[in-house]
Amino acid sequence: MKKKAIMFDLDNTLFSVYAIGETLFAPLFELIEQDGTQVQHMNKIRDEVMRRPFQHIANDYRFSEALTKKSIALLQQLQYNAPIEPFEDYALVRQLPVDKYLVTTGFLNMQQSKIDRMGLQNDFREIHIIDPSTSNKTKKDVFADIILRHRYAKEDVLVIGDDLQSEIKAAQELGLDVIWYDKYARYEPVPGVQKIASYQQLLAIL
């Protein structure tokens, strides 16, 4: 599998959100608990906030409009200001002799603070943060734009991420090759989707 460009997700693909999540999202969890309408769902919400866009969670658990607005206002301000360690195998990503792009969905301040804390700024040709609270863009839109602007053939592009319903689905809809990064083997294999748990495996594939 020879590629000229690889597009990476950020959360749970380059680092573990679970390593910082309890601290980062503590104000959000407190807000939801104080609201009192999601007590029976809190454990699930705590887990899902670490790996899914908040807007989807609020919709799935039927947050009130007021709670959703308060939560989004809070999340728009949240930043993480302590050091963040990327996955240990991320060092192998830095060495890849291809064009690398970072495409992440989330609140701008929060995602930028993660990037800054890991020092990723110079590792990628471009970094794209898609903030659903201010933009209707999708990862599919960004992938397509990168391919168009840089004149890549689709077969020269690979997308790597942890979310089957986000970057993996978007890439498949564009006809791009994908690799599903499942660091801790949380999920069962899916037919037709190549899965890895380490970037050492990526080197073997490339």
List each model region and its residues.
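Asp-based, Mg2+/Mn2+-dependent phosphohydrolase catalytic module
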Residues: M1-K4, Y101, Q112-L206
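Short beta->alpha linker loops
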Residues: V49, E88, G106-F107, D163, ...
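Substrate-recognition element of Asp-dependent hydrolases with the DxDx(T/V) motif
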Residues: T68-I72, L78-A82, Y90-M118, E126-S133
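Glycine-centered loop/turn motif at secondary-structure junctions
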Residues: E33-G36, R62, P97, G119, ...
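Conserved residues at beta->alpha junctions
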Residues: N12, L102-G106, D162
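N-terminal helical cap/lid subdomain that shapes the substrate entry/recognition surface
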Residues: K2-D89, R94
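Conserved Rossmann-like nucleotide-cofactor binding loop
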Residues: T13, L108, R186
